[in-house]
Swiss-Prot record:
Species in which this protein is naturally found: Staphylococcus aureus (strain NCTC 8325 / PS 47)
Alphabetic keyword roster: ATP-binding, Chaperone, Nucleotide-binding, Virulence
Family according to the record: Belongs to the ClpA/ClpB family. ClpL subfamily.
Protein name per the record: ATP-dependent Clp protease ATP-binding subunit ClpL
InterPro entries: AAA+_ATPase, ATPase_AAA_core, Clp_ATPase_C, ClpA/B, ClpA/ClpB_AAA_lid, ClpA_ClpB, P-loop_NTPase
Start-end of Low complexity biased regions: 58-72
Signal peptide feature range: none
Compositional bias annotation for Polar residues: 47-57
UVR domain span: 336-371
UniProt-annotated stretches for the region II: 383-575
Residue numbers spanned by region I: 81-332
GO biological process terms held by the UniProt record: cellular response to heat
Length: 701
């Protein structure tokens, strides 16, 4: 053939090109394209062979026909549905899905919507973790069992991956072509139902966002949805449904909302019982009923920011995985390989007439065989409630444990431990200790903070120190104290420092340093509002909700849980002018500074008393202990005489100012003088502190 394009010269060039490519030593590492189509080395060799017997035009036509046959084999509508999604109904037939417990109502509602003649598109709306995807899996199982209306008894639920639709669509029109193939696949199968998890992603998915006319997935699906040509099940959260789906009125009216609420604690326990067998088989760990109940109860109490049943299932899964890792299963392959090696060694020993060695090898073989037999189908560990407590502790950092004898004694002695650090304030210590014991023992109502207290009294008597010691004793970390100096919250913009700015104001997206964000990150904290009388009245209004309901809504609309915090407000109102407030009614004094509804929210209003000299004796010992801790880093020991202690108390005592002057005296007279002595005697290992001529002196050894 000789025309404008295919002629004898081109035929010769084509054959020469094929010959050069075939002779390359690196064919496997190259890519070959003919007419813009990539071909494999095998296809290239076949075309080369054809080119030897036919013209170049015939070879090109043969390649196009082969490509069309390949596209016909791979591009069928039925196959395309399998390529972009999972057939949940088939997985249900194969027994690959977990059982769905306690969701019969939602499954029934979804089945009823699917049975409609038009607009048969249910959308499951619920918060993250409540089990929306599980409901669709439950529907697939119901279809397999035949417990659905006749209109959908033959349906196949295909879970579609939206990213698979967008993959490889770098050219204009490619995405729309994929959608049309999807729609045609559903039409041709006549029984396919598409499931889009996180369906809000279809809004604008595939659109270019310009005026080029490129349409998104939702725009292409709308006509088919309204005519009932395809049926879709969607799942999304309340926020995403409001912010995305409801904004598109045309799309919204094509869906029927099915509300999915969080299951109760009782229902969650039944859910865990239903999936227990799957977890036991996977982890080879036994999971008794009391462990399942502990997963639900402890996750409700200590993981309030998440929802059931997801958080309870996670706790169960983490616990079982942890126990499985501690008791690893026998490696069957390695053990059998070792037995084979020992059999060879035994034969060699028998051949060499080393019967004692052969007998020892036989004993080792028997031990390994017994180990293999015992490991088959046996649970290697049994979970306990204490294991669940350890998991919660690893997740939250809170020392959660069962109420054993040691924990009971620790709760009983919490007041003694605090009293050893807070001198002269027994009433305040006892009131706080009672609130802690009530909460940790599980007798709290759980709808308010662990405790809320107003500490009132003169300066320097231990109000702030009690909050610090409480954070250390209760949560094991001084960083668990969130301290807010209310002098910084006295202006009218103080609310934004507490809950963050609202929409439309600067800093709306950056609320990292607010109280609500700190509590969200560390829900187990002691919150100290120091000198609360200096706060703006709007701050006190916010605290009313926190102390009454145990939660607070931040500037972005998120509800922050305060039910695992201890709220302490300190104030020296009424004590600042030398008034003898001890002889007055404390509530009468407080009403001069705070509204009655604010005072009425506290669990207790505790009056801190003036410190006398007897109390300072214990305080000076604590301050000197802190000095010794510093000296231990240098390997230096210290002895302080009683005369020196009395001298420090006499010099540092001030009834109106409390213990702070004593702290300054210890720093100036003890720490500074030890520092001066150390700089002159760097090899000192021991110092004695005494009084000579009404002066504190330091002598070393």
């Amino acid at each position: 053939m000789n025309n404008g394009f295919f002629n004898s010269d081109f035929d010769s060039i084509f054959r020469r090109m094929m010959k050069d490519m075939q002779g390359s030593n690196q064919v496997g590492n190259k890519k070959y394209y003919i007419n813009g189509k990539e071909v494999s080395p095998e296809e290239l060799a076949q075309l080369t062979q054809q080119g030897g017997n036919h013209s170049a035009e015939q070879s090109a036509q043969a390649f196009q026909q082969a490509a069309q046959r390949q596209q016909g084999q791979q591009g069928g509508n039925g196959n395309y549905l399998e390529q972009i999604g999972r057939n949940l109904t088939q997985e249900a037939r194969d027994g690959l899905l977990d059982p769905v417990i306690g969701r019969d109502k939602e499954i029934q509602e979804t089945a009823e919507v699917l049975s409609r003649r038009t607009k048969n598109n249910p959308i499951l709306v619920g918060e993250a973790g409540v089990g929306k995807t599980a409901i669709v899996e439950g529907l697939a199982q119901a279809i397999v069992e035949g417990n659905v209306p006749a209109a959908i008894k033959d349906k196949e639920i295909i879970s579609v991956d939206i990213s698979s639709l967008e993959a490889g669509t770098q050219y204009r029109g490619a995405f729309e072509e994929n959608i049309q193939k999807l729609i045609e696949g559903v039409k041709s199968s006549q029984n396919a139902v598409l499931f889009f998890d996180e369906i809000h992603q279809i809004i604008g998915s595939g659109a270019t966002g310009s005026d080029s006319g490129s349409k998104g997935l939702s725009d292409i699906l709308k006509p088919a949805l309204s005519r009932g040509e395809i049926s879709i099940i969607g799942a999304t959260t309340q926020d995403e449904y409001r912010n995305n789906i409801l904004k598109d009125a045309a799309l919204t009216r094509r869906f029927n909302e099915v509300l999915v609420n969080e299951p109760s604690a009782k229902d969650t326990v039944e859910i865990l019982k239903g999936i227990r067998e799957k977890f036991e088989e996977h982890h080879q760990v036994k999971l008794p009923d009391d462990v399942l109940k502990a997963c639900v109860d402890l996750s409700i109490q200590y993981i309030p920011q998440r929802l059931l049943p997801d958080k309870a299932i996670d706790v169960l899964d983490i616990t079982a995985a942890h126990l499985s890792a501690q008791s690893p299963a026998v490696d069957k392959v390695e053990t059998e390989k070792r037995i084979s090696e020992l059999e060879n060694d035994k034969r060699k020993a028998v051949s060499a007439e080393e019967y004692k060695k052969a007998d020892d090898i036989q004993n080792e073989i028997k031990s390994l065989q017994d180990k293999l037999e015992n490991s088959n189908g046996e649970h290697t560990a049994v979970a306990t409630v204490h294991d669940i407590s350890d998991t919660i502790q690893r997740l939250t950092g809170i020392p959660v444990s069962q109420m054993d004898d040691n924990d009971i004694e620790r709760l009983k002695n919490i007041s003694n431990r605090l009293r050893s650090k807070i001198i002269g304030q027994d009433q305040a210590v006892e009131m706080v200790s009672r609130a802690i014991r009530r909460n940790r023992a599980g007798f709290d109502d759980g709808n308010r903070p662990i405790g809320s207290f107003l500490f009132v009294g003169p300066t320097g008597v231990g109000k702030t120190e009690l909050a610090k010691q409480l954070a250390i004793d209760l949560f094991g970390n001084k960083d668990a104290l969130i301290r807010l100096d209310m002098s910084e919250y006295s202006d009218t913009t103080a609310v934004s420092k507490m809950i963050g700015t609202t929409a439309g104001y600067v800093g709306y997206d950056d609320n990292s340093n607010t109280l609500t964000e700190k509590v969200r990150r560390n829900p187990y904290s002691v919150i100290l509002f120091d000198e609360i009388e200096k706060a703006n009245p709007q701050i006190l209004t916010l605290l009313l909700q926190v102390m009454d309901d145990g939660n607070l809504t931040d500037g972005q609309g998120n509800v922050i849980n305060f039910k695992n915090t201890i709220i302490i407000c300190t104030s020296n109102a009424g004590f600042g002018n030398g008034n003898d407030a001890e002889e007055k009614d404390i509530m009468h004094e407080m009403k001069k500074f705070f509204r009655p509804e604010f005072l009425n929210r506290f669990n207790g209003i505790v009056e801190f008393l003036h410190l006398d000299k007897d109390a300072l004796q214990d305080i000076v010992n604590l301050l000197l202990d802190d000095v010794q801790v510093t000296l231990d880093k240098k390997g230096i020991t210290m002895d302080v005489s009683q005369d020196a202690k009395d001298w420090l108390i006499e010099e540092g005592y001030d009834e109106e100012l409390g213990a702070r002057p004593l702290r300054r005296i210890v720093e100036q007279q003890v720490r500074d003088k030890i520092t001066d002595y150390y700089l002159d005697h760097t090899d000192v290992k021991h110092v004695d502190i005494d009084v000579e001529d009404n002066e504190l002196v330091v002598k070393g050894k």
